[in-house]
Amino acid sequence: MNARRKKRLALATALIGGVAAIASLLLYALNSNLNLFYTPTEIVHGKKDTGVKPEIGQRIRVGGMVTVGSLVRDPESLHVEFAVHDAAGGEVMVTYDDLLPDLFREGQGIVAQGVLIEGGKLEATEVLAKHDENYMPPEVAEAMGQTHEKLEYDSTQKTGY
């Protein structure tokens, strides 16, 4: 092999190696920023089709209804804990250390984004409440099935006091 061909081969090899390295770094960055949506039942029992459960430490989104009577507030801080359930009976505890949205209530649909810290416990970094009595994220509506009913609220639930 002459010198010119060796130079071309080395250049082509370096170029292919560089493209492969950039592609792998790009895929790694995209994978670390991926937030998958799970229902409480899927967190507990795994996805229907594959049985895959989220791993401890994985960033996920979970959607469902806030279980009535599960909200516990710390009087000394903004820390709150509540349970989220779906129609299939799965339930996940969510902890959150910030102000809850104004529309947040027990019995309402929410989507919480955060890190799974135990098998059935999510440490949320963001909590989103539904916008009005008719709106529900498509994933939550599908997970809730036909059991979602319009809830009636008393005056204390409407005012939040």
UniProtKB/Swiss-Prot annotation:
Location of the protein in the cell: Cell inner membrane
Main location: membrane
Domain of life: Bacteria
Its membrane topology: Single-pass type II membrane protein
Record InterPro entries: CcmE, CcmE-like_sf, NA-bd_OB-fold
Residues the record lists as binding heme: H131, Y135
Ranges annotated as spanning the membrane: 9-29
GO cellular component, one term: plasma membrane
Cytoplasmic compartment spans: 1-8
Homology family: Belongs to the CcmE/CycJ family.
HAMAP family per the UniProt record, alphabetical: CcmE
Purpose of the protein: Heme chaperone required for the biogenesis of c-type cytochromes. Transiently binds heme delivered by CcmC and transfers the heme to apo-cytochromes in a process facilitated by CcmF and CcmH.
Name by which UniProt lists this protein: Cytochrome c-type biogenesis protein CcmE
Species in which this protein is naturally found: Shewanella loihica (strain ATCC BAA-1088 / PV-4)
Name of the gene this protein is made from: ccmE
